């Protein structure tokens, strides 16, 4: 999965997919009542990027729905996965459940079109704080209450705070999550970071007894870091330059080992070579 980083404006969806992304990451900020309000990152952000692009969340979901609904003029077949980077840092811990509830209602109405030929992309809810695990509970219970439990098949999870993996496993246990787990590791492109924790996450993924199904590394803009990530065995690379990642994937060392995921590849299944 080539994951376009910080895609917060509808026009950027097309831009990143054209460069080779089959997945995008979108920042979601919340208002004081725990309702998702904007797709917005703000400053500071990655070096070399405009941090201030934004949409209202509902408008972004409408644009995203069009880009992922077969038959729509804006449809882009390659775009199969969306990571919502949920900026819950502005919320009190006790608002996490409500944030999940509101997020589910928004996605149901504006992205899934109330279950009537909505967008088809898989969705990862990425939460920066383990204490906010109730966001997952609120999200799941709301979809069930609304009669759309089937849509949970399209939803996965990530805790993005670079926490210790046993702590992440215990947060999932509290949230009642047993699968559909992506694990991120990384840091802004302005700073270097080793692959130490990525390697631990991959070991958990491949152990057969861990909770992790997929591992992605962010933010990777250099060819050398891309190669290191592929050597380690990641499933996804988040980047500001999808064309760089696509380029490296076509190199002799990788083109037979890796391919770009399509809609038929289940993002919740651990890949077995």
Curated annotation (Swiss-Prot):
Active site, renumbered: 5, 41
Residues given in the record as Mg(2+) binding sites: 25, 27, 85
Disulfide bridges in this chain: 45-51, 47-190
Cofactor binding summary note: Binds 1 Mg(2+) ion per subunit.
Cofactor dependency: Mg(2+)
Keyword Flavoprotein included in the entry's annotation: no
Protein name (Swiss-Prot/TrEMBL): Dermonecrotic toxin LamSicTox-alphaIC1
């Amino acid at each position: 999965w080539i994951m376009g980083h910080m895609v917060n404006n509808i026009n950027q969806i097309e831009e990143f997919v054209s460069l080779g992304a089959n997945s995008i990451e979108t920042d979601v900020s919340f208002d004081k009542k725990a309702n998702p309000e904007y797709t917005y990152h703000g400053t500071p952000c990655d070096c070399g990027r405009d941090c201030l692009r934004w949409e209202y969340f509902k408008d972004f979901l409408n644009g995203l729905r069009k880009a992922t609904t077969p038959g729509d003029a804006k449809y882009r077949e390659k775009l199969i996965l969306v990571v919502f980077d949920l900026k819950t840092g502005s919320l009190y811990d006790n608002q996490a459940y409500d944030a999940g509830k509101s997020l589910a209602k928004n996605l149901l109405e504006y992205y899934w079109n109330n279950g009537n030929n909505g967008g088809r992309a898989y969705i990862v809810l990425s939460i920066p704080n383990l204490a906010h695990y109730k966001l997952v509970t609120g999200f799941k219970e709301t979809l069930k209450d609304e009669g759309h439990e089937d849509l949970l098949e399209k939803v996965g999870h990530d805790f993005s705070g670079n926490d210790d993996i046993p702590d992440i496993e215990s947060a999932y246990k509290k949230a009642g999550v047993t699968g559909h787990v992506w694990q991120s590791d990384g840091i802004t492109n302005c700073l270097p970071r080793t692959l130490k924790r990525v390697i631990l996450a991959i070991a958990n993924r491949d152990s057969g007894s861990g909770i992790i199904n997929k591992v992605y590394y962010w933010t990777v803009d250099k060819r050398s870091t891309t190669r290191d990530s592929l050597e380690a065995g990641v499933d996804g690379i988040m980047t500001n330059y999808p064309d760089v990642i696509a380029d490296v994937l076509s190199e002799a060392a990788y083109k037979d080992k890796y391919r770009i995921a399509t809609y038929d590849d289940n993002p919740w299944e651990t890949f077995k070579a």
